[in-house]
Regions:
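Conserved N-terminal segment of class I S-adenosyl-L-methionine
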Residues: 1-107, 111, 115, 128, ...
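Short catalytic micro-motifs in class I SAM-dependent methyltransferases
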Residues: 115-122
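A short glycine-rich, Lys/Arg-flanked "PGG" loop and its adjoining helix->strand segment in the class I
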Residues: 126-137
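Short, glycine-/aromatic-enriched active-site segment of Class I SAM-dependent methyltransferases
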Residues: 147-169
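C-terminal alpha-helical "lid/dimerization" subdomain adjacent to the S-adenosyl-L-methionine
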Residues: 165-167, 190-196
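Short alpha-helix
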Residues: 170-185
Length: 239
């Protein structure tokens, strides 16, 4: 893949790494880590973690700074991502692609994370089968992908929809597809949720989110409304 195919960098590193930028990143990533922490327990700081598709390195920075995890690795096919992330984390960063027959690591991991990447793959099952090779027995996978439920299709509505303009989103699938894929490639599902941010259409989600916040309600926990959440998230254990 050529570097120019990476559409990740819609912001500069300075804005992402600013106080406001990192506050947004923590709101996005920390709930995911807390769910994984329930299964890793108090040993999370000693966990060996691989993040695939590292972006700006913000998630690795949070694992390092907020959770004290030092045994961190990252893999990304794009040199620009590796270059930018080195300014954000001291993790062991290596160039590699999910589709590669061999990943550039020899020691197995307790946890492999992969956020908003599998929808870019021609054959998404490759991620799950490759990850299994690099996990310790009983190791965990935390994977997220666009939440293709009914509200996702509202992106196409004129005037109020937020269209998905990323041409590399070639495998945006319904949650049941990902459940079957995980179960069929040797994992058990420990947890699943729809999370992060209300999205897909303009105006209504921000107003509704603000109203729910005032009432102390979390839209991620409200059936039906949680379908407006941006991501479908799976926490898996290798069998």
């Amino acid at each position: 893949m050529k570097d120019e195919a990476n559409l990740t960098f819609s912001h500069n590193l300075e804005s992402v790494s600013s106080d406001d930028g990192m506050r947004f990143q923590r709101e996005k990533f920390c709930p995911r880590v807390e769910r994984a922490k329930k299964f890793l327990g108090e040993t999370i700081a000693e966990a060996r973690v691989l993040d695939i598709g590292i972006g700006y390195g913000s998630f690795l920075n949070i694992l390092e700074q907020d959770y004290g995890i030092q045994n961190l690795c990252g893999m990304d096919p794009f040199p620009k991502s590796l270059e930018m992330s080195k300014k954000n984390t001291s993790a062991d960063l290596r160039q590699g692609d999910i589709d590669d027959q061999e990943w550039p690591f020899s020691k197995p991991f307790d946890l492999i994370t992969c956020f908003d990447v599998v929808e870019h793959l021609k054959i998404p099952s490759v991620f799950f089968t490759r990850s299994a090779r690099y996990l310790k027995p009983g190791g965990l996978v935390l994977v997220t992908t666009p939440n293709k439920t009914l509200p996702y299709h509202m992106r196409k509505l004129p005037f109020i929809g937020k269209p998905d303009l990323n041409p590399t989103h070639i495998n945006v699938r319904v949650p049941e597809y990902w459940r079957r894929l995980a179960l069929g490639t040797g994992y058990e599902i420990l947890d699943e949720w729809m999370g992060e941010h209300l999205t897909h259409i303009k105006f209504v989600p921000p107003l509704l989110s603000a109203a729910l916040d005032k009432m102390g309600l979390d839209p991620r926990n409200i059936p039906g409304l949680n379908h407006f959440q941006q991501s479908f998230c799976l926490l898996l254990r290798k069998l």
